[in-house]
Amino acid sequence: MKKNDIFENLADDINNANFSEENKSRLLKNIRKLKSEKINLLITGATGSGKSSTINALFDTEIAKVGVGVDPETMDIKKFELDNLILWDSPGLGDGRDKDIQHSKGIISKLNELDENGKPLIDMVLVILDGSSRDLGTSYELINSVIIPNIGENPEKRILIAINQADVAMKGKYWNEKENKPEKELEDFLNEKVASVKRRINEATGLNIEPIYYSAGYKDKYDKQNPYNLSKLLYLIVKYTPVNKRLIYANHISSDEEMWKYSDEIKDYNREIKKSLFESVKEGISEGAEIGGEIGKLFGKTGETIG
């Protein structure tokens, strides 16, 4: 996924298309509207679950390591701004009862915050679980008692639960390092963990939230392991984002193809991500413009950016 500005490329494609000046004007106005949209994504989980590595892998950045600003009104939740993609990184839970209470209050406050239009500020919550841990009590408490009661409408479409560190879920056993994927024994174990998490949440809240498992990977001076199922995670993030906001991701998705190479292949997640982004283009820019089937002409530079 190439590092071009998708909104600039859309504008170029429109200006070069054989449309009336009136339609061009409407289309360009719609692009400005799309560009002005904001996504607010809250990322939370237990200490050591891999929130920072997940943020860095998804969005081709290392801001989560260095931190770029703290909002003192939200109990040390860090705010990372990638243009109009705004990531709220909550401190990890599980470091003591008093700290957990403090951090939970910060999360509740953020979930109840409204934007300038009086709508919930947070579009989606990504809860990251530590796949190598047997004790997920802190995570269940966070999901069932903090997030779900405070997230408001459509919780099943606004909460994503992702089990990280799939590669070490069985202490490193049954992970095929050469092919960077789980062998059958580990795959069965992970699928059971997904089913168990789903069942526990359903029993406590009545909601049906489908977790996934993945590995954010790592890189240091001596070694590197590519992510696994990161494309599945991004696919779900994009899928559950309102259509009019999805394009905001396009400028910030990691351009490193190795990040997206390995998955369970249940779907072609990379293809589905592109389809979701194109859907956002089609729906967002054509409002009020008479272009009909001509919309395909717009996907010159824009198609390169997404693809």
Protein language model regions, located:
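Membrane-inserting effector segments that mediate pore formation, membrane fusion
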Residues: 270-307
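Conserved GTPase G-domain substructure that encodes guanine base recognition and part of the catalytic core
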Residues: 1-86, 91-281
